[in-house]
Amino acid sequence: MAKEKKLVEAITSMEEDFTQWYTDVVKKAELMDYSSVKGCMIFKPNGYAIWENIQKNLDAMFKETGVENVYMPMFIPESLLQKEKDHVEGFAPEVAWVTQGGLETLQERLAVRPTSETLFCELFSKTVQSHRDLPKVYNQWCSVVRWEKTTRPFLRSSEFLWQEGHTVHATAEEAEARTVQMLNIYADFCEKYLAIPMVKGRKTDKEKFAGAEATYTIEALMHDGKALQSGTSHNFGDGFPKAFGIQYTDKDNKLQYCHETSWGVSTRLIGAIIMVHGDDSGLVLPPKIAPTQVMVIPIQQQKDGVLDKAYDLKDKLSKDFRVKIDATDKTPGWKFAAQEVQGISTRIEIGPKDIEKNQCVIVRRDTREKIVVSLDEVNEKLAEVLETMQNDMLEKAKAFLASHINDAHDYNEFKAIAETKPGFIRAMWCGDEACENKIKEDTTVTSRCMPFGDQEQISDVCVCCGKPAHKLVYWGKAY
């Protein structure tokens, strides 16, 4: 029993030290390991399999809307990166540069892509001539490099995996519609597959993406009450097209500039899953995204027939679910603890007494509820358990979010909430960046978004300066 206890004790309590808890979970659940390059990490099979499931399901949702996948080079010539002034200034501190190829010094530095707007713009400028060529709706799955000073696994790293979509359209209306459509796809995906509710809204001008006319965001609330920007969608208007000469002839044979969008999510979503659903025993994965949905654990497996029956059960379940069996010689208690640390959605226990009764025991990872089911009906019952678990995890996360949104009507109330109540603060804002800066300086709280669905005028004046205000903003401390 000491070994099982040690396995679980290796994870710090989240109430004691949330930061250390997170670090312990990503290591003990075998999601990642540190590499010899600071800020870069190794995805282990458990971690990469989660990303594969995110990629598979999100990619299918993209393609339903006409998105096509492409792949762009990793390197961007410096002259190309500098074509859009605001964009390059926004990324300059984080860009990694290649200055030498083999034994030769390069005539022009090459940026290791921090994002690929400029490459897509170059492509669009060559391939778009007529209104018949539009829209172009492209996406790529790749890694990008941003030389971060402070890094944390899955949340902020010097190299990370993501998808970046880039589109060009004939009209501003079409571009805006695509920008919002992709944000809605992200939010729907996170609810349906990750069991994470999102606050959707528009970023303030201070927080928007460099070079964008408008940035829309999905914001999730972590267990410690901090916000996590989990996906963004940008409307670039005709700024990039003008810088890169992306034009088309319309139906009247007149030359017009295109309107452009970009949108992306990254492996940061794995960090969100960990911090929304995890507990002191480790990872808790929603069944729809879990690499392994059920672990079969034989009890007293040394007894005649137990292992054979456990393998038969695994084969039967494998027709409908993602299944593994733990037939190692470790104790059942150790196996239970290992399954819980790794966040496997359920386990099925089967031993000699169960076999006599033609039954097995399903145990949910999130609640540890035990359900005795007939072996004849195990597939049907497990499907019900997994569906219920997925729904329960979403409802629990929704309840947590709703209970951690507080309204502030004046600045003293705002500061008191920021100091004592984790979560989002709803407050009115006049639109002046000076107030936004003051709030951040005084409280470390930043504007997260101006929400789409929530337009309640909770006050007539700005929470900071007291001037007339018409913009409701969600504020919060954030990763």
UniProtKB/Swiss-Prot annotation:
<dbReference type="GO" id="GO:0005737">
    <property type="term" value="C:cytoplasm"/>
</dbReference>
<protein>
    <recommendedName>
        <fullName>Proline--tRNA ligase</fullName>
        <ecNumber>6.1.1.15</ecNumber>
    </recommendedName>
</protein>
<keyword id="KW-0436">Ligase</keyword>
<dbReference type="InterPro" id="IPR045864">
    <property type="entry name" value="aa-tRNA-synth_II/BPL/LPL"/>
</dbReference>
<keyword id="KW-0547">Nucleotide-binding</keyword>
<dbReference type="GO" id="GO:0016740">
    <property type="term" value="F:transferase activity"/>
</dbReference>
<dbReference type="InterPro" id="IPR017449">
    <property type="entry name" value="Pro-tRNA_synth_II"/>
</dbReference>
<dbReference type="InterPro" id="IPR006195">
    <property type="entry name" value="aa-tRNA-synth_II"/>
</dbReference>
<dbReference type="Pfam" id="PF00587">
    <property type="entry name" value="tRNA-synt_2b"/>
</dbReference>
<dbReference type="InterPro" id="IPR036621">
    <property type="entry name" value="Anticodon-bd_dom_sf"/>
</dbReference>
<dbReference type="Pfam" id="PF03129">
    <property type="entry name" value="HGTP_anticodon"/>
</dbReference>
<dbReference type="InterPro" id="IPR004154">
    <property type="entry name" value="Anticodon-bd"/>
</dbReference>
<dbReference type="GO" id="GO:0017101">
    <property type="term" value="C:aminoacyl-tRNA synthetase multienzyme complex"/>
</dbReference>
<dbReference type="GO" id="GO:0004827">
    <property type="term" value="F:proline-tRNA ligase activity"/>
</dbReference>
<dbReference type="GO" id="GO:0006433">
    <property type="term" value="P:prolyl-tRNA aminoacylation"/>
</dbReference>
<dbReference type="InterPro" id="IPR004499">
    <property type="entry name" value="Pro-tRNA-ligase_IIa_arc-type"/>
</dbReference>
<dbReference type="InterPro" id="IPR002314">
    <property type="entry name" value="aa-tRNA-synt_IIb"/>
</dbReference>
<keyword id="KW-0648">Protein biosynthesis</keyword>
<dbReference type="GO" id="GO:0005524">
    <property type="term" value="F:ATP binding"/>
</dbReference>
<comment type="similarity">
    <text>Belongs to the class-II aminoacyl-tRNA synthetase family. ProS type 3 subfamily.</text>
</comment>
<dbReference type="InterPro" id="IPR016061">
    <property type="entry name" value="Pro-tRNA_ligase_II_C"/>
</dbReference>
<comment type="subunit">
    <text>Homodimer.</text>
</comment>
<comment type="function">
    <text>Catalyzes the attachment of proline to tRNA(Pro) in a two-step reaction: proline is first activated by ATP to form Pro-AMP and then transferred to the acceptor end of tRNA(Pro).</text>
</comment>
<keyword id="KW-0067">ATP-binding</keyword>
<dbReference type="GO" id="GO:0140096">
    <property type="term" value="F:catalytic activity, acting on a protein"/>
</dbReference>
<keyword id="KW-0963">Cytoplasm</keyword>
<dbReference type="InterPro" id="IPR002316">
    <property type="entry name" value="Pro-tRNA-ligase_IIa"/>
</dbReference>
<dbReference type="InterPro" id="IPR033721">
    <property type="entry name" value="ProRS_core_arch_euk"/>
</dbReference>
<dbReference type="Pfam" id="PF09180">
    <property type="entry name" value="ProRS-C_1"/>
</dbReference>
<keyword id="KW-0030">Aminoacyl-tRNA synthetase</keyword>
